[in-house]
Structure formats: C-alpha cells, structure tokens
Amino acid sequence: MCPFCFYFCMQIILKTVMEDKKSLAGAWVEAARPRTLPASVSPVLLGCALAYYDGMFDITPAVLCLLVALFAQIASNFANDYFDFKKGADREDRLGPERAVAQGWITPKAMLAGTFVMLGLACLSGLLLICFADWRLIWVGLAIAICVLAYSAGPFPLAYNGLGDVCVLLFYGVIPVCFTYYIQTLSFSLLSFLLSVALSLIHISE
C-alpha cells in the first residue's frame, strides 16, 4: 500500500470512529494520531522498494519492519500525549489538535499503560526480526525504544532541546530505510542511505 493510500484510509477510519469524540475507541484512535503514521510507513516502504529492486524482497520481515515502525510511532505519540500533559504543555484550551489526556478522554494512567503496550508490541516485532538477520539488531531496537520515551520524557526531552530534527533524520529516514533494506538483503547500500537522508529531509520540512 502506498503512503498516500494509507493516509486516506486512516482519514476515513478517523472520521468514522471519531464521530462521537467521547467514545473510548475514538479517543484512542485520535491519540494514535493517524495523520502522523505515513511518516513511519514511507521509509519502510522505501527500504522494501530498494530490496525489491535488488531482487531480495521478503514479505515476512517487510511486514515485521512495518509493524515495528507503526507500533513505535504510536507509542511515541501516546508518550508525547502523556508527558506533555504532565508537564503542563497540553491543556484543554491548547491551540492545534486536541490531545486525549488533556481533554479528559483518556486518563493519564491509561495513556501511560497504552504507551508501554505499544512499545512492547514494537519490541516483540523487532525480536522476531532477529530470525531474519543478526542478533545485533537488538541494539538498534534498544535505541528506538529509548528515543520513543526520550523524545518527550525525562530531564532532557529531545523534542524540546533542539534535537527533534535529529530524531526525524534518524528514526524517520536513515534507520527505517537502511535497516529495512539490510534485514532483507543482509547488506547496506549507499543508495539506501542517500535516499533515507532525502526522505528524512522531506519530513523535516513538513
């Protein structure tokens, strides 16, 4: 599925479920921020396209890479919702998209639990990828898991200390493109790196 098709499908789901914004299912869908998910899907698809071009595409690890990206993105969105509320950055009268915890749709405790559920699913999907590549992928997974939380949490949240663009460069470009390609081909390529940087720059400029 191309990123544009994915985006429009998520828009339809969002509009359908969120007709009643007070419904619990609708609140969780809104908290997942479907509009942001194509940013996670597109680098994985690019890595898969490069593997396919080289005749090495493998559907099973490709799907697992996609699940890692989606679960990690949703976990990051949930964490951002929770920690921004705790810091007072998100209030009920904030400008921009409404946030589930600030609006009272989801309790802080439930949002934190949801964060770790999504992060756990991302880690599980990542562990399964070791069967197709190398145990050292654990270090990549650990870096992803740490940054999911560190982006918004801790004494030095990356998003609020000038490192947001660096995170986008790494986690919406270089890492998902290059490692999706690597897991299927067991090699790195200069082309995958250059295209990953180009894609991340597009995300940064949005």
Q: Which residues are covered by each model-predicted region?
A:
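Intramembrane alpha-helical segments
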Residues: 97-187
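Hydrophobic, small-residue-rich transmembrane alpha-helices and their short perimembrane loops
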Residues: 81, 86, 193-198
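Cytosolic, membrane-interface loops and tails of multi-pass inner-membrane proteins
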Residues: 16-25, 82-106, 205
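Residue-level detector of conserved catalytic or cofactor/ligand-binding positions
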Residues: 200-206
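Cysteine-centered motifs
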Residues: 2-5, 9
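Hydrophobic alpha-helical transmembrane segments
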Residues: 37-41, 59-67, 112-116, 138-142, ...
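Topogenic membrane-insertion module of multi-pass membrane proteins
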Residues: 11-64, 68, 155-156
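Hydrophobic alpha-helical membrane-embedded segments
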Residues: 68-81
